[in-house]
């Protein structure tokens, strides 16, 4: 299935059923009173976070989603059946924006599994004429129509929720690293931009299988990424909610004059995209140490110590230096809070909180 992280849909709640205009008619009861039942409420539209889903692909195929209309009332004081609610399952981490008169409004952030929010309320069913009888109105010849359901145009934006985000220049070996520490099997090749979409991997502690860490690998960043260069800009949003970042630099991109220029370049792009993301806690990693001599490697380690940088030197391909790095990942993950908002619902009208509008009636001829 293709990875799709943005889609536009229209949701339409069900209409309320009309109230019934009816009078009791039985043998030997010439003046039976009103007995029209109420219409059923229309179905509402809900959004639910489902952690089994990883893409919005299905919402590119279908744009309109409608809940069921309420049934009209009937005679003998029979109320109409309520319309069935419609529940749309979305990936965890989906942001929901509604189009309003002043632009888009964030109405829901599905950042927790099984979180559910109401986005379009069904219309209320109309009252039957039996509802309007009184001591002064014995035979009301009118009933109330059902209300229309709410309708909204929504934009869905998926931001993957992960504990750690892998960032770096293209061809730094991020995909090889995630394949070594998790069960993820991304495409790996010796050329830039092998990773075209985010990959998710789950790292499981060998001692405690319930101890898990979700790692997101995004396409490599290049200079000018914040302006749309390369592939990274589109996917940077997928590391916005991570607890921390793992910044991987290939030893091939480590020079003599300024060995850490690659780190600085990517960090500058992060800051230009989002100032807070640029300050996110990072673990710096130099990968592919199998490509240099032991003397060159030792010189780089000495330079890192002299510059006061804590840099992990590894070879993801040959499984060199991974164990200390993995232990650091666990320690940082468990000591850092997740950057994720709570589920919220705002900006959309909840019909249940409104006063019932002035009665609209349907008259019949005498």
Swiss-Prot record:
Residues 1-161 form the Obg domain. Residues 162-334 form the OBG-type G domain. This is GTPase Obg. The keyword Metal-binding applies. It comes from Desulfovibrio desulfuricans (strain ATCC 27774 / DSM 6949 / MB). The keyword Cell membrane does not apply. PANTHER family: DEVELOPMENTALLY REGULATED GTP-BINDING PROTEIN-RELATED, MITOCHONDRIAL RIBOSOME-ASSOCIATED GTPASE 2. Keywords: Cytoplasm, GTP-binding, Hydrolase, Magnesium, Metal-binding, Nucleotide-binding. GO terms for biological process: ribosome biogenesis.
């Amino acid at each position: 299935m293709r990875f799709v992280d943005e889609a536009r849909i229209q949701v339409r709640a069900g209409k309320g059923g009309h109230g019934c205009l009816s009078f009791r008619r039985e043998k030997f009861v010439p003046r039976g009173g009103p007995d029209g039942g109420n219409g059923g409420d229309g179905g509402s539209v809900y959004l639910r976070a489902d952690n089994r889903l990883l893409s919005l692909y299905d919402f590119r195929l279908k744009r309109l989603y409608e809940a069921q209309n309420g049934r009209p009332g009937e005679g003998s004081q029979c109320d109409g059946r309520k319309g069935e609610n419609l529940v749309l399952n979305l990936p965890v981490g989906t942001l929901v924006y509604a189009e309003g008169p002043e632009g888009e409004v964030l109405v829901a952030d599905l950042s927790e599994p099984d979180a559910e929010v109401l986005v379009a309320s069904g219309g209320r069913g109309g009252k039957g004429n039996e509802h309007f009888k009184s001591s002064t109105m014995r035979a009301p010849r009118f009933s109330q129509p059902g209300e229309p359901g709410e309708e909204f145009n929504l934009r869905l934006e998926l931001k993957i929720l992960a504990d750690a985000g892998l960032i770096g220049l293209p061809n730094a070996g991020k995909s090889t690293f995630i394949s070594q520490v998790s069960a993820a099997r991304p495409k790996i090749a010796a050329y830039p931009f092998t990773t075209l979409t985010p990959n998710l991997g789950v790292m499981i502690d060998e001692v405690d299988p319930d101890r898990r860490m979700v790692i997101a690998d995004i396409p490599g960043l290049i200079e000018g990424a914040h302006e749309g260069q390369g592939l990274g800009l589109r996917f940077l949003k997928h590391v916005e909610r991570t607890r921390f970042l793992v910044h991987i630099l290939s030893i091939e991109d480590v020079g003599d004059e300024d060995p850490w220029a690659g780190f600085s370049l990517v960090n500058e792009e992060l800051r230009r995209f989002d100032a807070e993301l640029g300050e996110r806690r990072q673990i710096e990693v130099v990968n592919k140490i199998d490509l240099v001599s032991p003397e060159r490697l030792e010189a780089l380690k000495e330079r890192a110590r002299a510059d006061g940088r804590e840099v992990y030197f590894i070879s993801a391909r040959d499984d060199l230096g991974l164990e200390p790095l993995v232990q650091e990942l666990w320690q940082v993950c468990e000591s850092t809070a997740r950057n994720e908002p709570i589920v919220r619902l705002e900006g959309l009208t909840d019909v249940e909180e409104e006063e019932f509008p002035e009665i609209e009636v349907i008259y019949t001829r005498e």
